[in-house]
Amino acid sequence: MHASAQMKKAALEATRQELDALCARGVRMEGNAFSPIVLIKGELNDEERAGGALLGGADGTALRASCAAIGYAPEDFCALASVAGQGDDPALEAGKTLPTEVFREALEALDPEAVLLLDTAAADLMRETYADALVAIDDFATAMLKPGLVAHVLGRRVLALDGFEAALGDKREKQRMWAYIKQLGPAGAPY
């Protein structure tokens, strides 16, 4: 095996082990860990709280379609919960917000170029976790992750929404969410 291929294989294995360890501790993730976009959800629905797939319902279907429409490949879909699931880390209580250091560890392990915060709970945790980087943003509303504004945080584009799943039942709200999401197309996309 070529040295470069061996290095890639070793890096892939190290990433897999890091993500497996986070999941074993109680961090909930679904999808492609190498996706350029990560969708973060904090307000889980009944199915998700009962252990169902994260973004496995109508919200996930709509988000997959939205991501595809703005240029992401179908496999470019990764979801991260800002609340803990079942795990072996006694510091993580299922259903409770992840500690900031664990959330940061998970997001840095995924290392996306874009982050979509789907609800207020996700935005609150992002704001608390990355306060050190957000304070450097000149515009106060952007630094506070006001819904609809794209913030550049440690080389990532971050966009907060204020309740994507709840907006699905209201045509105007759904259109507003779509207008926001269109700002977060893939880096280098020609549109």
Language model region names:
Residues 1-191:
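A polyanion-binding, active-site-adjacent surface
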